[in-house]
Design a protein with these regions (language model features):
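Amphipathic, positively biased hydrophobic alpha-helical segments used for protein targeting
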Residues: 9-11, 62
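Sec-dependent signal peptide recognition
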Residues: 2-7
């Protein structure tokens, strides 16, 4: 009898663990029901393609190392953006890419939603759909490699979006047309002469 009771207890414990795991898993599922419609659509697009996010807060979802992306971040907050047409930005996708110093200003003129982090060695695009981020980064690469001027890239952006809206399937919106890079981080150089010891001593030296 004791043996039967013990077995029954183990079954109950096992069921409790499974239910507990299920509840924990369900708790990790993001609730975006109160988010703006465009942000919810972005979440659905990325979740359908890459699965559940790796990080969840009340205002943003994060996926790490999915497809070609080092990071994908979708935010509840949307930012108005008028280029190439009126829309809002909320989906940022990031790749490993070393932007040459002499091209940094040109990228800023091309599209304010294409950004880079020289220290981390990344380049990002922030728009409303993955395809638009592919497009922005592909055109940014064209500028960096000298294939297009800033004006040519901005015109191409509009032309390609029109093609897509008219039922086309432009390559620049399907994937990155170039390979992402490695070893792109740039720690910069110490040109101040200061050391950690100097900082700890308030710059007074030893």
């Amino acid at each position: 009898m004791k043996k039967i009771i013990s077995m029954f207890s183990l079954v109950l414990i096992g069921l409790g663990n499974v239910q507990g795991q299920g509840m924990k898993k369900e708790a990790m599922m993001p609730d975006v029901s109160s988010w703006p419609e465009a942000s919810k659509m972005a979440v659905k697009e990325i979740t359908d393609k890459y699965g559940k996010p790796d990080g969840v807060t009340a205002n943003e979802l994060i996926w790490m190392n999915k497809g070609v992306w080092k990071k994908i971040c979708i935010t509840k907050m949307e930012t108005k953006h008028s280029f190439p047409i009126e829309h809002t930005d909320m989906m940022q996708t990031t790749i490993m890419y070393k932007v040459p110093e002499d091209k940094m200003d040109e990228l800023g003129v091309f599209d304010g939603s294409v950004t880079f982090d020289r220290t981390q060695g990344t380049m990002s695009a922030r728009c409303d759909m993955e395809g638009n981020n592919f497009l922005a980064l592909n055109l940014a690469h064209d500028i960096i490699t000298g294939k297009k001027t800033v004006d040519e890239a901005r015109k191409a952006y509009g032309d390609i979006v029109k093609e897509k809206m008219n039922g086309g399937n432009p390559e620049y919106m399907q994937k990155l047309t170039f390979a992402t890079q490695e070893n792109t981080m740039d720690p910069d150089k110490n040109t101040t002469g200061l050391t950690k010891a100097d900082v700890m001593n308030g710059g007074k030296g030893k």
